[in-house]
Regions:
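N-terminal capping/linker segments that flank leucine-rich repeat
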Residues: 2-95, 108, 130, 152, ...
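N-terminal compositionally biased, intrinsically disordered segments and leader/signal-like regions
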Residues: 7, 13, 19-22, 105, ...
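Conserved hydrophobic beta-strand positions in leucine-rich repeat
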Residues: 72-74, 96-98, 118-120, 140-142, ...
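Short "repeat-start/strand-capping" segments in structured domains, especially the N-termini
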Residues: 92-94, 113-115, 135-137, 157-159, ...
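A generic tandem-repeat structural signature
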Residues: 97-152, 160-166
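Eukaryotic tandem repeat interaction scaffolds
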Residues: 153, 160-226
Length: 290
């Protein structure tokens, strides 16, 4: 009996050793594949993009390049967005509205060739160089930033609407070739010369308030104007405006009867101004002198 127990114990011990050896030789079980990281380092931007990704709109799964390859718009107003990294994957993007954020670098959107409408008003942008190749652009709003150089815009020949209010512009020369613009806001800058506007033949609205403009001569050939805002400049002579409106009134009456002019806070002689306003009103022009 004792011998049988000894044999049984030996067999059992040997089995344990064998099992242990086999277990030691087996490769460790694979860990579950880790989820891919989000392509958007800025969580606030990711949230704005997620709203356009139907499959992940209501969960927190990381967004991948494939998820955003075909989205056409991203809207994220006043969301404290700082970093646009990740947007470079949105190859089909046509509309981007990130008004009132903290964006400084536009590099991630430099190759989004389908962009037609970009609103970045109220950010911290000074360099618009990355926009230079976006020639499909039709609406661009850069109001309330720190832009001083418009050269990157000079090939945006499809631009219709351009808002540049409250920047640090001293010249608008680069926009002279952009003949399709019909609405231009350059208010509250440091602009002295309107000459580049002379070639914008389709211009209907010009907001140039709060600059250092002295002469209206460059606008005399603009035949589509219906709103002119020039308050708060250094204009002392309204003759160019009177002459262009008189010419229109005596001709095909294309714009004068529909034109609104805001000209308050300019150093215009009161008597001359009264005479000019009377003439302009006789042509059908609405004058606002406050």
């Amino acid at each position: 009996m004792q011998r049988l127990l000894t044999i049984f114990a030996a067999i059992t011990f040997g089995s344990l050793i064998t099992c242990s050896t086999v277990a030691a030789d087996e490769p460790p079980a694979k860990e579950a594949d880790a989820k891919p990281a989000s392509i958007f380092p800025d969580a606030n931007l990711e949230a704005a993009v997620r709203a356009e990704v139907f499959a992940k709109r209501y969960n927190d799964e990381p967004i991948t390049p494939e998820d955003v390859a075909n989205i056409s718009r991203v809207v994220g107003k006043d969301k404290k967005i700082k970093d646009l990294s990740g947007l470079q994957h949105c190859k089909a993007l046509m509309l981007l509205d990130l008004e009132s954020n903290q964006v400084t670098d536009l590099t991630p959107i430099a190759d989004l060739k389908r962009l037609q409408s970009v609103t970045l008003a109220g950010n911290k942008i000074s360099d618009i160089g990355p926009l230079a190749g976006l020639t499909s652009m039709q609406l661009l709003d850069l109001s309330n930033n720190q832009v001083s150089d418009l050269k990157p815009l000079e090939k945006m020949s499809n631009l219709r609407t351009l808002y540049l209010a409250k920047n640090t512009l001293e010249t608008i020369d680069p926009i002279a070739p952009l003949s399709k613009i019909w609405s231009l806001d350059i208010s509250d800058n440091k602009i002295k010369d309107l000459s580049p506007v002379a070639k914008l033949g389709w211009l209907t609205t010009l907001d140039a308030r709060g600059n250092q403009i002295e002469s209206l001569s460059p606008i005399v050939e603009l035949r589509e104007l219906d709103m002119l805002l020039i308050s708060g400049n250094k204009i002392s002579d309204l003759n160019p405006l009177v002459e262009m409106c008189q010419k229109d009134a005596e001709g095909d009456r294309r714009f004068a009867p529909y034109l609104e002019v805001y000209l308050g806070e300019n150093p215009i002689d009161e008597k001359a101004k009264a005479d000019h306003i009377t003439k302009l009103e006789s042509f059908g022009v609405d004058i606002y002198d406050k």
